[in-house]
Every structure is written in C-alpha cells, then in structure tokens.
Amino acid sequence: MLRDLFVKKKKYAAIPSEQVRKDVPDGVMTKCPKCKKIMYTKEVLKNLKVCVNCGYHHPMNAWERLDSILDEGSFREYDKEMVSLNPLEFPNYEEKLESDRKKTELNEAVVTGEGTIDDMLVVVAVMDSRFRMGSMGSVVGEKIARAVEKAYDLQVPFIIFTASGGARMQEGILSLMQMAKTSVALKKHSNAGGLFISVMTHPTTGGVSASFASLGDYNLAEPGALIGFAGRRVIEQTVREKLPEDFQTAEFLLEHGQLDAVVHRDDMRESLRKILEVHQGGEMAVWQS
C-alpha cells in the first residue's frame, strides 16, 4: 500500500455504461453527414431537414416533401393500393418488398396525387428513397405514367421530385420498359401544352436520370444533389481520367447547362409558385385533344 503512494497510477478514460448511453433516446439527436455537427433532431425538422450549420439537405420522405410544398390539406392520393409482384421470381424479392412496406408504411417507392400550391391545382409525384432506394420498377413507372395522364386530363401542370438509384434490377426488362412508358406519357402531356417541372433531389441516378427526371420544361435540383447515370468510378475507369471533385453534383450540372436552377429547400415552394403563376393563361390555356 505504501508503494502505491509513490507510483503514478495510469489514467483511463471512463467509458459510459450501456445504461448511460440509453439515456439519450434514439431520434433525439441528428449528426450532419457533411459538417459532422450534432444537433437536436427537432431543430433539423423545423428547418425542413436542412443543417442549420452548413446547409446540407438531409433526405426527405414523401410525406415530408408533400407537406413542404402543397397547401395544407389539399393533397389527394392516387393509386395507393398498387403493389409490386415478382414476375421474374427473383430470390427474396417479396421479402424485401414486405420489409420496406413495414419500414416506410408505403406500398411503393413513389407517392402520386393532386394538390394545390397557392390554390393552383397540380398533379405531383414524389419518390421516396427509403423504399428499395427509390428504384423504378413496374409499379413506380405505372404510377408515374398514370399521374402524368391525369395531369393531361385535368389540363394542369405535373411536378415530380426524384430520388432514385435507377431501374430496379429485380424486375429486369420490365423495369427498363418504364423509362420509355413514362417518357411517352410526358411527351403527350407536352404536346398538349402541359407544363412539367422536374425537381431532382439526392440521389437521382441510373435509368431515372436518363428518362423522366431530365425531361422537364424546368429542370431544378436541390443543393448538393448527386445526379448522373453511371457511377463516378465506372466513368473514371472507362475514360481513364480523374473527374472533377464536384462532378455529378447539382452545381456542376448547372454550370454546364444541364439544369435551369439549383433551389434551396427553403425557397422551393415559392419558386414553384412563381413558375406556375407565370404559366397561368396564355398558351397554357390552349390544350389539344
């Protein structure tokens, strides 16, 4: 014991017990993946899920997105009960679909319907990346095509918010067919004088970026959104060149003429309202059957 008085004891960092770590319930705090700042989740939600420190746009689910742009209580959903099957009998596909349905409380990776922005009627589709990474299968393509056709019938603008990893591999060619189907529906809408606004959010890639996401009369994007067809590494290996650091970001695409504007989430509803207001009357009122 006397020896202990003259020996410097090593100091160790105290590791909190499992019970102490559980004192902070899940979901109370949110860590920004960009600036690493830890904030109260309620502050992030209050700011439309935009980091108050660096402006990083956290992903929004479909319902959060609809609430942020439409007049309160105006949304009426289309085709809610449509669900994907497994036509190619892809192993474990049904289980993955069911898991995502329980996790997201959605039947598929897109929510479609109609609502108003400042009392102006629009048909809207919002992709939700929580469901199979927002991938486009036969039901996603069908719901979007039907929504476009509804906009055509109602003679109102169509708005889509994209967030997708591309075509859904478990549905093979049936998934790839949706690229053509949605594009044809949009062409019909456009030929009749219909307005189409595409808003690309993080990420918008693969077959979605190569089809309806890029066909808007106005192509908008959120800051920092990843937008592209093939992945960065695949392109670098193919062209044998190092790509710019900001390659495939919304800002890069805007600089190179592929977007009309990069719009902060705080300004999105007002930007859409202004576009809709500009297109009221005039040639927009002339529809061809």
From Swiss-Prot:
Residue spans, zinc finger C4-type: 32-54
EC number: 2.1.3.15
InterPro entries registered for this protein in UniProt: AcCoA_carboxyl_beta, Acetyl_CoA_COase_Trfase_b_su, ClpP/crotonase-like_dom_sf, COA_CT_N, Znf-ACC
Pfam families: Carboxyl_trans, Zn_ribbon_ACC
UniProt keyword annotations, A-Z: ATP-binding, Cytoplasm, Fatty acid biosynthesis, Fatty acid metabolism, Lipid biosynthesis, Lipid metabolism, Metal-binding, Nucleotide-binding, Transferase, Zinc, Zinc-finger
Cofactor note: Binds 1 zinc ion per subunit.
GO cellular component: acetyl-CoA carboxylase complex
Catalysed conversion reaction: N(6)-carboxybiotinyl-L-lysyl-[protein] + acetyl-CoA = N(6)-biotinyl-L-lysyl-[protein] + malonyl-CoA
Gene3D superfamilies membership: 2-enoyl-CoA Hydratase, Chain A, domain 1
Entry similarity comment: Belongs to the AccD/PCCB family.
Function comment: Component of the acetyl coenzyme A carboxylase (ACC) complex. Biotin carboxylase (BC) catalyzes the carboxylation of biotin on its carrier protein (BCCP) and then the CO(2) group is transferred by the transcarboxylase to acetyl-CoA to form malonyl-CoA.
Protein name: Acetyl-coenzyme A carboxylase carboxyl transferase subunit beta
Native organism: Bacillus anthracis
